[in-house]
Amino acid sequence: MKRVLIMMLDSFGIGGAEDADKFGDKGANTLGHIASHQPSLNLPHLESLGLGLAAKESCGELPKHFQNQPHLIGGYAFAREISSGKDTTSGHWEIAGVPVLFDWGLFPDKQNSFPKPLLDRIVAKAGIKGYLGNCHSSGTVILDQLGEEHMKTGLPIFYTSADSVFQIAAHEETFGLNNLYELCEIVRTELEGYNIGRVIARPFIGNKAGAFKRTGNRRDYSVEPPAKTVLQKFIEEKEGMVVSVGKIADIYAHTGISKKVKATGLEELFDKTLEEVKSAGDNTIVFTNFVNFDADFGHRRDVTGYAKGLEYFDRRLPELLRLMKDDDLLIITADHGCDPTWQGSDHTREHIPVLMYGAQVPARFLGARETFADIGQTVAKYLGVSPMEYGTAII
């Protein structure tokens, strides 16, 4: 019986998106710009799976520090996104075979971002005295700006971004983690009709500006996908096991998930992934999201941190390869870009890498994929699930 291992390097785009100009992202290239800004970038194991060549096929240029003719042990491709947005939810859903062909609701105003009637209902339902923020911001900046005031007043911090999100930051100790989660559940309910993809709980600790730190107790409250993902169909049709490591379960609104494994940070995410692969039986999908590439490095525009994170992942990749059985299929991919050299702090519209490894995967270029949904269709075919509506199987 077969297993599929999906490693989602959150935000690890490889440039080249033909519609990037529509998003203000023409020229954005997460991998390419990391490579060009680093005096050295050593990713030999990802390179052997075709990362550099996938990037070259994507944008026409081999990233710095990569070889034109590496020793290939896996198949490689790049994929275009057909979903209307460049957000986490759209990318993950499309990868699972359900592209987002509608427009998410947004809060476009930089200040006073949320409608007053919505805020009034939230305040009344939650029994809070008010709120701080109500603006666009990156998570770390707003903590420095409003964290101390939040601790003094007890008012939660509301903020958003270019994505379809309503984010709430609150101190774990002075506000309380459960209080934050309960508030997020109220907001999720009140957002009905606004078509907002996620409410995100952003707990933090610390006692003064410059010392505040977000914790690993983040929680995403997503809407459910509009159709069955390959994960759901695998469970229903094949009685399969789907193991979520990290925030995968939250992104799919806990649909199509058999087991949830919490982990924080690249090291723990990799450790937990290895544990689950070791213990997983046949007929299993292990799906891990390495969120730190996005949250810690991409949004914070930390080129060096992103590069070091990639090198850490690459160093540990052989541990995963050694655990693979003859009938296992490994897919390493991303959900969007977040170029750490780009202006602002938002995601960037880019192609994603699709790196595949397994006994049945030819070591060659596997094509320019017209949708992320080709990944979901590949998983469906490999595991004997009925075909998805979107996508073409890669192998």
UniProtKB/Swiss-Prot annotation:
Which residue ranges run through the membrane?
A: none
One GO biological process term: metabolic compound salvage
In Swiss-Prot or TrEMBL terms, this protein is called: Phosphopentomutase
Question: What gene name is listed for this protein?
Answer: deoB
Q: What is its main location?
A: cytoplasm
Pathway assignment reads:
Carbohydrate degradation; 2-deoxy-D-ribose 1-phosphate degradation; D-glyceraldehyde 3-phosphate and acetaldehyde from 2-deoxy-alpha-D-ribose 1-phosphate: step 1/2
What is the species of this protein?
A: Actinobacillus succinogenes (strain ATCC 55618 / DSM 22257 / CCUG 43843 / 130Z)
Q: One GO molecular function term?
A: phosphopentomutase activity
Cofactor dependence is on:
Mn(2+)
- Assigned keywords, A-Z: Cytoplasm, Isomerase, Manganese, Metal-binding
